[in-house]
């Protein structure tokens, strides 16, 4: 149990039959009435984001999330197979668990699998990945007035905006948080 007064960003709690991650919180002490904590929470099972208000001093249950380092092996239809690096145990996850993550997953990539009481909640990717450009228009020399961009498709099928100097075959560093171009590798 933890007091809502001790909330921290990234804390996982169990409230209303759900496992929630604290994204943001604010302690509020109005001039009249008692203090409360306004929080923004993400449901780790569904991905839904909800704002919730707790009375000051209220206690909530902490949820101990287990993070296991695993290696992505391969896709088998709509199932994706991961292997635990210590035990070599294989875990299969359906594609609907990995909708966004599939844009960046490559064979042999190391990821963190998050679970709570043996229930898999999701996959945490590395902050950046290196992917090869498979398709893009050729850049036009001299057409760089205002940091212009063009569309490029990488080896996983993900499409993003890149600077004009990027060509097919280039390896890009991509931010997995928002899917944006960072640099060439």
UniProtKB/Swiss-Prot annotation:
It is found in: Cytoplasm. It comes from the Bacteria. Pathway: Protein biosynthesis; polypeptide chain elongation. CDD domains: S1_EF-P_repeat_1, S1_EF-P_repeat_2. Pfam families: EFP, EFP_N, Elong-fact-P_C. GO terms for biological process: peptide biosynthetic process. Belongs to the elongation factor P family. This is Elongation factor P. It comes from Staphylococcus saprophyticus subsp. saprophyticus (strain ATCC 15305 / DSM 20229 / NCIMB 8711 / NCTC 7292 / S-41). The lineage of its organism: Bacteria, Bacillati, Bacillota, Bacilli, Bacillales. The gene is efp.
